Amino acid sequence: MINKIRFVVFSFALTAFSGLSAQNDTTFIANGNPIIQYKYTADPGAMVHDGKVYIYAGHDECPPPKEHYLLNEWCVFSSPDMKTWTEHPVPLKAKDFSWAKGEAWASQVIERDGKFYWYVTVEHNTIPGKSIGVAVSDSPTGPFADARGSALVTNDMTTEYTKIRWDDIDPTVFIDDDGQAYLYWGNTQCYYARLKKNMIELDGPIIPV
């Protein structure tokens, strides 16, 4: 009986220790492709900063056996050598945008003047269709917070060019040599617009490509 009790206690302690280790151990060695094999990720966007590469991706939590997707949050992974990676847990969730109802779709992060701006695709809460929001952080790994309190681009801003509700997706950002920043996005119809230096406002009309 004593041996059985010892075995149960040992097993419980080992299980608890293993769970704690797995929870705290966020660094792993990539073993071929896909790089991230312990969870489902989608729509990766990469950024290089201070000798490290960062990958920002949506986290697909759809439970089996459903054959769809469930994206409520984004992940960020960093690597100094493209082999050893570290996950920095939950830098941003779709619900961090009070005006959004969910769906953490494709996104892109860029650095400017020591701040990191994350342009994301979400479903708007009151304006039907996909919208683009922007979050900001002092660190490439977050945490990030809504930089505006409202969407940067909404579906009703582009109905002149297409009637679909999901054309305002997949944002990316480019800063030209003269310092002018541009936002690019689209689906079936592509768009671009200049950004103000604060990186959270459009600086001119939306131009179809």
Protein language model regions, located:
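Bacterial Sec-dependent N-terminal signal peptides
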Residues: 1-26
